[in-house]
């Protein structure tokens, strides 16, 4: 074991330090010339040790710099990819919104105003018809429903009485029935039917 330890020390230490340590062990006392020579050798030994340490540190430093550069390149490429992807998404959203606005505006300016009113009027008419059905049925009689069933095929009467009046009939009984149905709160229904 004692023989292996000096061999390991010799491998770890530079040769100048090994020579100096062995020289100090072998020589118990030396002259001034020996001290000067050992001092000069010590200076060169320090430079040799510094060079070896610098070489080892420089190699590790170069490796560290290379690894950091590669890591920075990867991070930079990923960040630019994500930024570019976000910009493309924003551009697509803007283009889609512009196309939607163009289609919307062209549909409204190109004569789409009247069909929209026509589309909205029947829905409003349906709501008012459903809301006012009990009132209309309360004021109208079943005889009016039979006379006005053939008035307009577009409207469906869900109650016992049809809200639109029949065409003008020469008999006074038909005119009276039409006036009684017109006086009911279903006048809005007639207006929505006429508008649509």
Swiss-Prot record:
GO terms for cellular component: membrane. Residues 95-106, 124-135 have a biased composition (Basic and acidic residues). Keywords: Glycoprotein, Membrane, Signal, Transmembrane, Transmembrane helix. Residues 24-60 are extracellular. The chain crosses the membrane at residues 61-81. Residues 1-23 form the signal peptide. Glycans are attached at residues 19, 26. This is Uncharacterized protein C11orf87 homolog.
